[in-house]
UniProtKB/Swiss-Prot annotation:
It holds the Pfam family RecA. This is Protein RecA. Belongs to the RecA family. ATP binds at G67, P68, E69, S70, S71, G72, K73, T74. It is found in: Cytoplasm. The gene is recA. GO terms for biological process: DNA recombination; DNA repair; SOS response. HAMAP family: RecA. The keyword DNA damage applies. Keywords: ATP-binding, Cytoplasm, DNA damage, DNA recombination, DNA repair, DNA-binding, Nucleotide-binding, SOS response.
């Protein structure tokens, strides 16, 4: 197609003027954008990284994680912090709920000596701290726990029973407009944890909604719905939760995928158990009866012992993880097909055998 040389000359002149006024890179052709390959941070779960499509949560974006109480929201964000710190990144935790347990965080692999933590008095203060950390360019990951606890200053200074209609939604809307551009420029990942509320009078459709208005739903590049689907037992003792995460919104890859994994109390995401399950599903690990083998060598009798072997041999675990990651990220539908048989399974899981009861 022939291009008018006068138009080309005019376009070059206006692009030059815009770059001179607003800085280099303020406008460019989309194909010239070198940041198109999105940098990501692992969630701590291989199946969730694959379900997200890009291999983890995207840097420079806003992410919302929501679900019922005790579903694993804070645990998932602490796993993200631990993964980021292993890569040498700086992380901050804005604890609006004033409920962060440093001992539990340490058990999940978080370096609490280098984790920045703030317990703000008001919602405005929390969001201003987020903005200041973002603009500094020195912080890579910020967690806000939670949107429901970001109480506007007017509500705190008022009396219980006073009406404060729409204050939190207005505060969040202003913050989103301010933060979105700064996050992109500083390449900072901002994760909001949110709670679920019920809409009154809803007869048809889903009555659940999240707090803080609609602004966060629009500005978030990724929204994750996390649910507890069953209990994990060792004998009669409950030692963890079966967890399902649905990717409700995804601007960096295909949405609506889901991942299932285990969260063990005091340990976090059961990564080795996940490697065993996915390894068997994709023929990397052989299973004969109760015995599991990798490259011809037996690694354990029973799923728990195979997982224990991988925990004690991190080099082999890393090798399996790398192979699975390359296989599944190049063909995400393989994860869906391997999980299809279990999509409707809800109940209790025996940690040793992996059987549902």
């Amino acid at each position: 197609m022939k291009v008018d040389p006068n138009k080309e000359k005019a376009l070059a002149a206006v692009l030059s003027q815009i770059e001179k006024q607003f800085g280099k890179g303020s406008i460019m052709k989309l194909g010239e954008d070198r940041s198109m390959d999105v940098e990501t941070i692992s969630t701590g779960s291989l199946s969730l990284d694959v379900a997200l499509g890009a291999g983890g949560l995207p840097m420079g974006r806003i992410v919302e994680i929501y679900g019922p109480e005790s579903s694993g929201k804070t645990t998932l964000t602490l796993e993200v912090i631990a993964a980021a710190q292993r890569e040498g990144k700086t992380c901050a935790f804005i604890d609006a709920e004033h409920a962060l347990d440093p001992i539990y965080a340490k058990k999940l692999g978080v370096d609490i000596d280098n984790l920045l933590c703030s317990q703000p008095d008001t919602g405005e203060q929390a969001l201003e701290i987020c903005d200041a950390l973002t603009r500094s360019g020195a912080v890579d990951v910020i967690i806000v726990d939670s949107v429901a606890a970001l109480t506007p200053k007017a509500e705190i200074e008022g009396e219980i029973g006073d009406s404060h209609m729409g204050l939190a939604a207005r505060m969040m809307s202003q913050a989103m407009r301010k933060l979105a551009g700064n996050l992109k420029q500083s390449n900072t990942l901002l994760i909001f944890i949110n709670q679920i509320r019920m809409k009154i009078g809803v007869m048809f459709g889903n009555p659940e909604t999240t707090t803080g208005g609609n602004a966060l739903k629009f500005y978030a590049s990724v929204r994750l719905d996390i649910r507890r689907t069953g209990a994990i037992k060792e004998g009669d003792e409950v030692v963890g939760n079966e967890t399902r995460v649905k990717v409700v919104k995804n601007k960096v890859a295909a949405p609506f995928k889901q991942a299932e994994f285990q969260i063990l109390y005091g340990q976090g995401i059961n990564r080795t158990g996940e490697l065993v399950d996915l390894g068997v599903a994709h023929k990397l690990i052989e299973k004969a009866g109760a015995w599991y083998s990798y490259k011809g060598d037996k690694i354990g009798q029973g799923r728990a012992n195979a997982g224990k072997y991988l925990t004690e041999n991190p080099a082999i675990a890393a090798e399996i993880d790398k192979t699975l990651r390359e296989l599944l990220l190049s063909n995400p539908s393989a994860l869906a097909s391997s999980a299809s048989d279990d999509d409707n399974v809800e109940g209790n899981i025996d940690l040793e055998t992996g059987e549902v009861f």
